Amino acid sequence: MLVHSKSGRWAAWGLFGLLFLPLFALPLLVVVAASFATHWSGAFPSGPTTENYAAAVRGESLQALTTSLVTALAASLLALAVGTWAALAAATLRKRGKRFLDALFMLPVAVPSVVVGLAVLVAFSRPPVLLNGTSSIVILAHTILVTAFAHQSVSAAIVRLDPAYEQAAASLGARPGYVLWRVKLPLLLPSLTAAAGLCFALSMGELSATMMLYPPDWMPLPVRIFTATDRGSLYSGSAVAVVLMATTLLVLLAVSRVRTRASYR
């Protein structure tokens, strides 16, 4: 009731500004400001330049961006496939089985991602499945880390589905496979695209597990940012970070547009 009054709305906006600006907006604005600077003296950056961005979109930085895009795309598609399959399977299980499956998929989220990276490194550093030193081990680790979010998103969407559509299709003689591909999955499409976008964004920003696994020829952009700032190249690292943020945001906006179109079908 408080927010419906004029004073309540002003208080809500004031609280939002008080929390949003120092916690979210200002740190990002500082990174953007640093990306255009050559040095920082006093309270503000100085020496404005665009050379940091010129370096951020060529050479090793461009290769790292491509690596991140390929890794995130592959991991999000794999996570979406596995998470959707698990969510559909869990919907047919009893309560205890569903809880067990949910807990199994949430396990990688419950532990630090560096632990997941170590587990993948130990598990796949020897035959018969030797992935250490390849790009596949990075994609696998990212898939493990983001599958839980795909599983939870699709599971929540399945619970909200009206069973009348499936029942109507089945009563007309449609086979289970046809009902799945032509009825159920199209109804889940908005949730599937949202889950894919979330998995993509999480994969694009993953660092801890990646640091333990990436080979020299498969360095994702977050690792590139870390190594740049670790060497003292704070301003060029900030430019690369802005490129990472912008790329992820553009992909999320595209996914949101696809989801909106799917919702109106």
Segments predicted by a language model, with ranges:
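Hydrophobic positions on the alpha-helical face of helix-turn-helix-like DNA-binding modules
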Residues: 168-169, 179, 183, 225
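Short cytosolic juxtamembrane segments of multi-pass membrane proteins
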Residues: 1-2, 258-265
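Gly/Ser/Thr-rich beta-alpha loop segments that engage phosphate groups in nucleotides
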Residues: 85, 175, 217
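Membrane-water interface segments at the C-terminal ends of transmembrane alpha-helices
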Residues: 8-41, 54-159, 183, 187, ...
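Short hydrophobic, aromatic-rich alpha-helical segments embedded in or entering the lipid bilayer
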Residues: 44-57, 216-230
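Transmembrane helix boundary and interhelical loop/hinge segments in multi-pass membrane proteins
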Residues: 36, 46-49, 157-167, 176-178, ...
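Glycine/proline-centered hinge or cleavage motifs at structural transition points of membrane proteins
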Residues: 172-174, 186
